[in-house]
Amino acid sequence: MDGNKGPVVVTGASGFVGSWLVMKLLQAGYTVRATVRDPANVEKTKPLLELPGAKERLSIWKADLSEDGSFNEAIAGCTGVFHVATPMDFDSQDPENEVIKPTVEGMLSIMRACKEAGTVKRIVFTSSAGSVNIEERPRPAYDQDNWSDIDYCRRVKMTGWMYFVSKALAEKAAMEYASENGLDFISIIPTLVVGPFLSAGMPPSLVTALALITGNEAHYSILKQVQLVHLDDLCDAMTFLFEHPEANGRYICSSHDATIHGLARMLQDRFPEYDIPQKFAGVDDNLQPIHFSSKKLLDHGFSFRYTTEDMFDAAIHTCRDKGLIPLGDVPAPAAGGKLGALAAGEGQAIGAET
């Protein structure tokens, strides 16, 4: 890339990843057009408008993935698009029409807007680890060449299945459109994103990441064999790939692998005020982690800066500051019950959300 500092578009700009990315881009000197579904929602836009540099280089634009063409105006004249927005409704009663269809059609609407603009040099799409490793027989390691088994996801309908399917199908559709229309398209594939955040509510990624603290057993299966990346590292990688002249294709963005046992020990050591469970029904004490390889990203010269401890320290302190989790004395959930599902191999990486 030629170092042009914008303007660039960030979709889903009020979300967990989107808002942090807007902050990082402003810090780097970019002019940013932030798209949100409802610019009148002060709770969503206030954290963005208060960022350093926002007064001079940030504008808020209305756009919705479910409305074809709604991104055209924001994208017109831009040099780059960071597509982060995605529907995330794990409780949807009609996932095909409420999650999968708007994700894929919204992706293609954005691709068409980029083609029409004629100024967009690169599109960076935030995909998910769920587009890579969801299959009947998990492997010990994955890289950017692996794809989830869509038929398996639709048949088994594990937690978050519609999110995994939507990301994989949107990514494939965008890659095909980019190839046919001469667009420069890159997808970055984060694993479970953990760290500090700007938004007011609890990000879905942290509902999962902090499940051992909150006692949310339904999310333990995801932590069984989990891969992690710090939010700040992810956003740095997104900007890095946007600017790197040789970047192309898919990139895993994952700095650490862990098991639920290792996370439980680490959290108990660092936060003894919480009663963290240490035993999990049906989970082998010698369980080995599953590795997600970021070699392709690292080979370009990128480096991760944060440890697993950094991720959780920042996430927990931010949640405490916002009153989203108690300061301590959380009763530990009993072993068994939903934990038995861990033995069935349901643990999968979810990745990022807006």
From Swiss-Prot:
The keyword Zinc does not apply. One of its GO terms (molecular function) is dihydrokaempferol 4-reductase activity. Gene3D superfamilies: NAD(P)-binding Rossmann-like Domain. Its EC number is 1.1.1.219, 1.1.1.234. GO terms for biological process: anthocyanin-containing compound biosynthetic process. Transmembrane segments: none annotated. It comes from the Eukaryota. The keyword Oxidoreductase applies. Pathway: Pigment biosynthesis; anthocyanin biosynthesis. Keywords: Flavonoid biosynthesis, NADP, Oxidoreductase. It is an enzyme of class 1 (oxidoreductase). It catalyses: a (2R,3S,4S)-leucoanthocyanidin + NADP(+) = a (2R,3R)-dihydroflavonol + NADPH + H(+); (2S)-flavan-4-ol + NADP(+) = (2S)-flavanone + NADPH + H(+). NADP(+) binds at K44, Y163. Bifunctional enzyme involved in flavonoid metabolism. Belongs to the NAD(P)-dependent epimerase/dehydratase family. Dihydroflavonol-4-reductase subfamily. This is Dihydroflavonol 4-reductase. The lineage of its organism: Eukaryota, Viridiplantae, Streptophyta, Embryophyta, Tracheophyta.
